[in-house]
Amino acid sequence: MAKVREVYQSFTDSTTKTLIQDEAYRNIRPIMEKHKLSNPYAQTIEAANDLEGFGIATNPYSIELHTHAAAKTIENKLLEVLGSLLPQEPVTFMFLKPRKLNFMRRNPRIKDIFHNVAIEPRDVARYPKETIIHKLAEIETDTAYISDTLHFLDPSYIVETFQNCPKLQTLYATLVLPSEAAFKMESTHPNIYSLKYFGDGFQYIPGNHGGGAYHHEFTDLQWLKVGKIKWRDPKDGLLGHLNYTHEQVDTHTVTVQLQESFAANHLYCIRRGNMMTPEVRTFGQPDRYVLPPQIFLPKVHNCKKPILKKTMMQLFLYVRTVKVAKNCDIFAKVRQLIKSSDRDKFSAVELVYLVSYMEFLAALQATTCFSDTLSGGLLTKTLAPVRAWIQEKKMQLCGLEDYVKLVKAVDWRPVDFSFKVETWDFRFTQLGMWKAFQPSELSDVEEMNNFFDDGDLLDCFTRMPAYAVNAEEDLAGMRGNNQEETSTAPREPEGEKKEYINPAETFLDKLTRKHNRETRSRAAKKAKRLAEIQDSMNRDRTEEGSHKTPNMGEAPSNADLPGVNEVEAGTTFPTLKALPQKWEDASSTDSSTIDPTEIIPGEEDDKAATQKVVVGLPWKHWLPQLNAVGFKALEIQRDRNGTMIMPITEMVFGLDKEEFPEGTPEALARELKAMNRSPTTIPLDLLRARDYGSDVKNKRIGAITKTQAASWGEYLTGKIESLPERKVAACVIHGAGGSGKSHAIQKALREIGKGSDITVVLPTNELRLDWSKKVPNTEPYMFKTYEKALIGGTGSIVIFDDYSKLPPGYIEALVSFSTKIKLIILTGDSRQSVYHETSDDASIRHLGPATEVFAKYCRYYLNATHRNKKDLANMLGVYSERTGTTEISMSSEFLEGVPTLVPSDEKRRLYMGTGRNDTFTYAGCQGLTKPKVQIVLDHNTQVCSANVMYSALSRATDRIHFINTSANSSAFWEKLDSTPYLKTFLSVVREHALKEYEPAEAEPIKEPEPQTHMCVENEESVLEEYKEELLEKFDREIHSDAHGHSNCVQTEDTTIQLFSHQEAKDETLLWATIDARLKTSNQESNFREFLSKRDIGDVLFLNYQKAMGLPKEPIPFSQEVWEACAHEVQSKYLSKSKCNLINGTVRQSPDFDENKIMVFLKSQWVTKVEKLGLPKIKPGQTIAAFYQQTVMLFGTMARYMRWFRQAFQPKEVFINCETTPEDMSAWALSNWNFTRPSLANDYTAFDQSQDGAMLQFEVLKAKHHCIPEEIIQAYIDIKTNAQIFLGTLSIMRLTGEGPTFDANTECNIAFTHTKFDIPAGTAQVYAGDDSALDCVPEVKQSFHRLEDKLLLKSKPVITQQKKGSWPEFCGWLITPKGVMKDPIKLHVSLKLAEAKGELRKCQDSYEIDLSYAYDHKDSLHDLFDEKQCQAHTLTCRTLIKSGRGTVSLPRLKNFL
């Protein structure tokens, strides 16, 4: 599977991954449905893992609760297995509820028989009344089943059942017996059940639910070993067999075999006849346990509890490797190895025995005391066996040598859940003598003191069976008994042979006594299931409130809109109608146009003036149609080129005006005639229909249609292809957005009401809901999305609204497929965007849009709008009568609460991932009407068609805000002026320093942690594994032909050789580092990359802005804060030593090129644990030296933005900058959630991966802080034109820039929030490229589209936040006790300092770092795992032995 998994993980294409996931889901569904019967419950993660080990799947989304869900699931699974074994004929079920037949998938028509006896009071409620009997009747079927009862029965029950039921051949039985109880162990499946032991037995508690518990005696465990049961014919008495031989006895046998076993639940098959059965019966054992030998006297002082073999081996190797294993050291080691959650499973006495045993092993010599067979001559080798025999006899007389003691002491006995199958022979033993074979009952005190004197529980268990005895030995023993004892032996009960004697009498008595002895109560009934979420799709949606806009009142509801009066015949000019004060809903769609209200005409002179104007209008003959849709149309308007705008365009003449088909509602026909939209017959293009049908059949397009059966697709294409031709009456209505194309139709539908044979087909679900809202008095199924209409059928009249957004060929295919369609009505806009098919394989991708096909059947185009104001509409070439001025603005900032229009669907998904759910594409916004919209301009805008741009620009009624996130290219080419020397560019500013950090008041001193002790460890235990794989020096060094080998592996000390020493003078390493870390380019390519990544940079900034709580509007520039930040930067620089300032003279000179960078190799010791002893030396790191004024300028910029960032950042975000470990620890204790897994993030080549996208992000961030434009342009210049001796560098981050730390940190935050969907309130800590979160967030869906465009690649590390697994951040572990240095990394660094002989120089620093962990003392056992404890102990001992320490050494001396 590892190879297969590796292949699957190598797939990076999102489409391929989607296909794999779809295929996997199709396979998962039937499997989950199969397991739903036996496991419908909500399980814990641990229980689900255990169940999967038994082959039982768990639905992670199940919410059905149960008090012991895992145990009940196993019970159900066994019933399912049993159901597959039972014959399809009547079966007798005993002690079973009839409803459990469902789990067996049993046919209810089979007339099964139920025999249930009410043994306990709760059985009356458990079993249906009709299935309860007073005595178990004779079984008259071939097969029977006993449910979860056999473990309480005597063997006599099986004997008498088969003896008195001659028809019975097979008896299945389930029983619940944990095999580990034979060793008095804790439950091996604690997530399923637990065990409690008492003097006479134990209690099995499913799911820790006391109400489902029941008591077992240890003798019940005999059922785990039974293989055969034999008995004699009952016609003769017991004594009558004494004179018979073994062969003369009439023998009856049943064979018992284990059919299936899950945890403590087992299914037995008991078959009449003497058959073969395995000699050994094995039960599941998840872990390997051992028992130490009994070597101490009295035996009570030996280890009796089985212990994990792994733990025993760890303890044994520990005591044999340390120099002196003290008693306290061994106790400390035991504490490390035993999990905190498992400590309650051990008694203190057992731990004392275990430690004493290990101390005994530590004191013995492990060198053999015997001679070898290789030394000596012939005589010596000949006498060697004799000498060995004498030595062995001598040890028997005088005592064993240490070596022999050690070998015998470590001869651990494995605890195996495999038992030898036994035969229970009753031919010569009374059936009533079951109790004689039980162990003698002891009191609790006696059992504690004496039970193990004769051996452990395993021995007792193996002695308990008395039914596996040899028959001849039993017979001889019985003959030896005196006659008096034999004559008084109890006889079998007598009675009529044909009458069935109830064999459950003993069983009833036994359970009655058990019930009286136990004091437990039944738990509450199973918790109620969660109420199902009701489907709200059929509810009436609450009508949203409309927006109020200037010069535009509140929109009226559609129900209150007045109708349109027909123009009176015989008038010389039309009746004039005034525009309504309230026209349209600001949130309505294109089809939401409102009828005007009629007003009484004015005075006669007004009529005359109006008549004069009308006569001069080019469209005077179209005024009735224009008035019908709410336009006066008395004004001549012109576009920006001075061309007159005609409200009626694209007129088509010569179209026949046909009558409406029969059955067309009168109201609908009347409205269409009023608009001059009479139908005309259209011949459909069947080739377009066939292309669409082919794509649907082959599942190349669509969403819902892909789920249809293949036969449906065949039927669709077959019906279309069978038509020679198809004609249909059609009314084609074209008009601008907001012209009122659909309003008249909606008015007619409201008038028609319910009962019509009309279907409205919409391209989107949003538009369907809009129509349902505006025409509420019709059937909901009248309005359908286009795929639903194709699958579910339509009426005889079909209205296609916004049909340009329907797939090409769809209209033809639907009309051809549904032959009942008589009339189609098409509404759309030929000037707006059309449907775009993204599938390359689709045939319809090559078809022209539907508007081109049907435009020739549209009588005219209504080029007027009620939506846009006149100025904007005229610029778009559209007629409008809305007065006022449309507000146009442009900036790089986003407006809040305003819909955002972007050019690409990819950008839309990314923006929605930042929380901007009201984001639409230019094309996808068609149908939207809003008072304000903001349009994002990027490099994709220029490739958008005119139709798409018209859709975007015509959405707003009042304001359009353009967002330009790019830099001003003209300003970019302006260079910074030459700067003076250091003494002149250090400006004198007023001493208005930023407010310094004021530490919080000291908290009350907490009570110190209790002292502790950790076991002594081997000095090399941490680094030993790394040294074992260490290669030779020149095998690890980097080699180049020009400069030879590098010199990173130094000295002969293997400890020092683990660490790579990188030196600036190493030429080979320098050039290897340059090749690996630096990439060259040119200024033009860099700037081109910067511009091409604008789409990504603004997404990064929006996520950063949301994460850090920055205000939505730009932050006004503060000169006072800037000067204070500049003063801090200058003061920091001047605080350097005089030598450092003199060394920087070259970079302070005005002759030093502003864009010039000096590159050096950083000298350092590589101490990262993951890089210890690498087979090949890795390249080093570079340091860049910039022009000093450049560093100080951009350092000021970074500090300025940091000042505002700290003012706004949420409390759950911590940036480790100019803070102390105490600050971080206090923050973590207040904000970090330790109850769930956490995520730490690392990156691959973080500095080199910060390309143009990150630069774009930094520019937007600077603009949001209103940094002066000339500084932003200078920063872009230095990033795109940074020059080294090899040429111009590519855009990247360089160590030595002014804002390196702040920029790295902020890029880290932006990337993290762009990639992950981080829940609100999540604690986050950042510093440069390091970060950690207190949860494991999901990756945003939108990030998959962005991932390949970013060079930055993260390496998330998930920790479980439990002992030994805490999130790491900058070398610190974040724990429930606060932050502390990673003990392994601290120890590794300390060992390097010790090996170099420099420990005394830096001991104070190491003691301070160590103190953050050491102060917690005893709590460290709950925080560190074994390896971390080893490193911590060795660090403490090393510092103590060094003999010098002034910080925390006095406290450390108390450690050991």
Curated annotation (Swiss-Prot):
Q: Which parts of this chain are annotated as the region Disordered?
A: 474-499, 513-563, 581-600
Catalyzed reactions per annotation: RNA(n) + a ribonucleoside 5'-triphosphate = RNA(n+1) + diphosphate; ATP + H2O = ADP + phosphate + H(+)
Give residue spans, biased composition: Basic and acidic residues: 529-547
For the RdRp catalytic domain, which residue ranges apply?
1236-1343
Q: Which GO terms describe its biological process?
A: DNA-templated transcription; mRNA modification; RNA processing; viral RNA genome replication
Please give the CDD domains that the UniProt record associates with this protein: Alphaflexiviridae_RdRp
Which InterPro entries does this one have?
Answer: (+)RNA_virus_helicase_core_dom, Alphavirus-like_MT_dom, DNA/RNA_pol_sf, P-loop_NTPase, RNA-dep_RNA_pol_alsuvir, RNA-dir_pol_PSvirus
Q: Which UniProt keywords apply?
A: ATP-binding, Helicase, Hydrolase, Multifunctional enzyme, Nucleotide-binding, Nucleotidyltransferase, RNA-directed RNA polymerase, Transferase, Viral RNA replication
Q: Which residues cross the membrane?
A: none
Record field: compositional bias (Basic residues): 513-528
Q: Which residues form the Alphavirus-like MT domain?
A: 59-224
Question: Which residue windows does the record flag with biased composition (Polar residues)?
Answer: 480-489, 586-595
**(+)RNA virus helicase ATP-binding domain: residues covered:** 695-862
Q: Which SUPFAM superfamilies match?
A: DNA/RNA polymerases, P-loop containing nucleoside triphosphate hydrolases
- Please name the GO terms that the record assigns under molecular function: ATP binding; ATP hydrolysis activity; mRNA methyltransferase activity; RNA binding; RNA helicase activity; RNA-directed RNA polymerase activity
Q: What is its EC number?
A: 2.7.7.48, 3.6.4.13
Domain ((+)RNA virus helicase C-terminal) spans: 863-997
Q: Which residues bind ATP?
A: 735-742
Q: What does this protein do?
A: RNA replication. The central part of this protein possibly functions as an ATP-binding helicase.
Family to which this protein belongs = Belongs to the potexvirus/carlavirus RNA replication protein family.
Q: What is this protein called?
A: RNA replication protein
**Which organism is this protein's natural source?**
Potato virus X (strain CP)
